[in-house]
Amino acid sequence: MSRVYNFSAGPAAIPEEVLFTVRDELLDWHGIGMSIAEVSHRGEEFIGVAEEAERDLRELLAVPESYHILFLQGGSRLQFAMVPMNLLANHKKAVYIDSGVWSNLAIREAKNYCDPHLATNAKELNYTGIPDQATWDMPNEAAYFYYVDNETVNGIEFPFIPDTDLTLVCDMSSNLLSRPFDVSRYGLIFACAQKNMGLAGLTIVIVHDDLLKRSPLPTTPSYLQYALHAKERSFINTPPTFAWYLAGLIFKWVKNQGGVAVLAERNQRKAAKLYKFIDKSNFFDNPINPTYRSRMNVIFRLADEILNSLFLKEATENGLANLKGHRLLGGMRASIYNAMTEEGVDALINFMGQFEKRHG
């Protein structure tokens, strides 16, 4: 069997050890004569899987007991609506940062429910960084403060937690479990699973109990109410059981790697060596302010964009898959989430060096 290095932005690479476990358990999970994909979501087998996954995630992120962890259907984009629906309460205003494609989409969705107030807009920097926090326009009152921790398309990542007294809401879809952080600084965190936690179709929400007491907007469907999901422990209806099971396996894998702090060091090394190569090159370029460069999604361009197709073709032939940049930006993008090995990054750097020698 020959596997490639998969640099896809999502669905993304899954640790091989996890895939081997899935393969071994797929037909007969723990000797019950069935796949975990076939069991009842209310049976003791899956309830055990679900509870263990939640315990492991709570341990990995040091989530306080004053927070609920929800395992919900749908992608992060659904949260663009669920957040204002559930958290606005009597407020007319919510604060947002426009840092790139995904925050911009969240702002557009929020306009259906409130008046999004822009604290700052990275567009003025051509989305190559975040304006200095001292320049942000921060109101004294608002329902919440929303930002995207890592912009997968633009290749921007926050190196700090914004300083605010407002309820902090964060989209961590592409970097949850990639570095330690203080959960207690946040009111609500959400992340889709297909970057660092497995399969598309599952989104994890970590929400403080106090926010569950806010009254949703009157038009909010019951199925989109956080409080109801919390009350039913994410079992209002049949949850995405296989995605939940796989996320649990990945949580075990993270623990076996030594935890989130160990992965953070590895992620920093991977990103640093790739950026170092790009910065030394006259053939490849990354436009992002080094302070805000993403550790998860490294975007780069070739000096001669006519060579883009050839670069992608030869990369694929050399076992380096899914390096094409997002359709909105073009160029290249190497997504190096937790599951990407250092060997994979080294292989990419080696190929880029050889390609530059041939065509630079």
From Swiss-Prot:
It holds the Pfam family Aminotran_5. InterPro entries: Aminotrans_V_dom (IPR000192), Aminotrans_V_PyrdxlP_BS (IPR020578), Pser_aminoTfrase (IPR022278), PyrdxlP-dep_Trfase (IPR015424), PyrdxlP-dep_Trfase_major (IPR015421), PyrdxlP-dep_Trfase_small (IPR015422). The modification N6-(pyridoxal phosphate)lysine is found at K195. One of its GO terms (biological process) is pyridoxine biosynthetic process. L-glutamate binds at R42. Transmembrane segments: none annotated. Keywords: Amino-acid biosynthesis, Aminotransferase, Cytoplasm, Pyridoxal phosphate, Pyridoxine biosynthesis, Serine biosynthesis, Transferase. SUPFAM superfamilies: PLP-dependent transferases. The keyword Phosphoprotein does not apply. Binds 1 pyridoxal phosphate per subunit. Pathway: Amino-acid biosynthesis; L-serine biosynthesis; L-serine from 3-phospho-D-glycerate: step 2/3; Cofactor biosynthesis; pyridoxine 5'-phosphate biosynthesis; pyridoxine 5'-phosphate from D-erythrose 4-phosphate: step 3/5. The keyword Transferase applies. One of its GO terms (cellular component) is cytoplasm. PROSITE patterns: AA_TRANSFER_CLASS_5. Its EC number is 2.6.1.52. Signal peptide: none annotated. Pyridoxal 5'-phosphate binds at W102, T152, D171, Q194, N237, T238. Catalyzes the reversible conversion of 3-phosphohydroxypyruvate to phosphoserine and of 3-hydroxy-2-oxo-4-phosphonooxybutanoate to phosphohydroxythreonine. This is Phosphoserine aminotransferase. It comes from Coxiella burnetii (strain Dugway 5J108-111). The gene is serC.
